[in-house]
């Protein structure tokens, strides 16, 4: 069984080589519809490869040090722990940015904060989903700030930003749900011609995020 796992992993890696995902390097992952079919497929393949490696008890550690910064402007359980687990799997330590305990409360700008937290950061995950027109725009502001810091030599590397839910997309949730469905039906080809029903539950005691 272990040998079969290794064979399957190698096949997935070979499949990954056939996809064009060059634009994803040194780039952010904000909205699902901004990515090409190849980039979405490559993301699914990498997820499956990592899953296979973990099931085969093969280390996925890519980093000896570094930070994964999380900023949650709304409550989270599944996404918070998923992000922390992913960072840990790859060898990054997670540091949660509490804006109330930072210099942001004293007037520090987004540009200043973004660069300050990015000195040893490889990835920044942000959830900002409460207000229409705000969340995704804020993520782009942070992205532009770290890009400027990297360009000007303030940062030796540019951290990648990941949308952990904004006002218009819940990227990581959509991707995880889609991959689960693909695996459940036995492959993406099996989805052709299928109908998927989506239900919406509303409770006055729970504020549903906009996206």
Label each region the model flagged:
Residues 67-120:
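Active-site cofactor/substrate anionic-group-binding motifs, chiefly glycine-
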Residues 73-88, 178, 182-211:
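Glycine-rich phosphate/diphosphate-binding loop of Rossmann-like nucleotide-binding domains
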Residues 119-131:
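A glycine-rich helix N-cap at a beta->alpha junction
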Residues 132-143:
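Active-site-adjacent beta->alpha loops and helix N-cap segments on the catalytic face
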Residues 138, 161-181:
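A glycine-rich, Thr/Ser-enriched phosphate-binding loop motif common to dinucleotide/cofactor-binding enzymes
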